[in-house]
Amino acid sequence: MQIFVKTLTGKTITLEVESSDTIDNVKAKIQDKEGIPPDQQRLIFAGKQLEDGRTLADYNIQKESTLHLVLRLRGGIIEPSLQALARKYNQDKMICRKCYARLHPRAVNCRKKKCGHSNQLRPKKKIKN
């Protein structure tokens, strides 16, 4: 049977499948046609995300049905050592008491003209975890 896969760009892909095909198989066919790796594909039908191990019949996908292809967003956790480095970089600053400019940790005077290059600086407050 024939089904359609619509991408977010509006492009429609036509696939030849069987109702016994798994979602994995469909994703592999999409990869063959479009070059998108299966682990980056999310298929949506009737508002539901389709799970890899299940078949088209499980979701009652029939001939000429339209699936929607969405790309998976990759993001996630920052490694703890990088998180500590970012925290150190963002918190070890001096703040001008007049114009609130952020300055490097060893600053003696503000770099801004509007406060007259003030020497009234304080350390940036530490945020609590």
UniProtKB/Swiss-Prot annotation:
The lineage of its organism: Eukaryota, Viridiplantae, Streptophyta, Embryophyta, Tracheophyta. One of its GO terms (cellular component) is nucleus. Ubiquitin is generally synthesized as a polyubiquitin precursor with tandem head to tail repeats. Often, there are one to three additional amino acids after the last repeat, removed in the mature protein. Alternatively, ubiquitin extension protein is synthesized as a single copy of ubiquitin fused to a ribosomal protein (either eL40 or eS31) or to an ubiquitin-related protein (either RUB1 or RUB2). Following translation, extension protein is cleaved from ubiquitin. GO terms for biological process: modification-dependent protein catabolic process; protein ubiquitination; translation. In the N-terminal section; belongs to the ubiquitin family. There is a cross-link at residues 48, 63 (Glycyl lysine isopeptide (Lys-Gly) (interchain with G-Cter in ubiquitin)). GO terms for molecular function: mRNA binding; protein tag activity; structural constituent of ribosome; ubiquitin protein ligase binding. There is a cross-link at residue 76 (Glycyl lysine isopeptide (Gly-Lys) (interchain with K-? in acceptor proteins)). Keywords: Cytoplasm, Isopeptide bond, Nucleus, Ribonucleoprotein, Ribosomal protein, Ubl conjugation. The keyword tRNA processing does not apply. It holds the Pfam family Ribosomal_L40e. Residues 1-76 form the Ubiquitin-like domain. It comes from Oryza sativa subsp. japonica. This is Ubiquitin-ribosomal protein eL40z fusion protein.
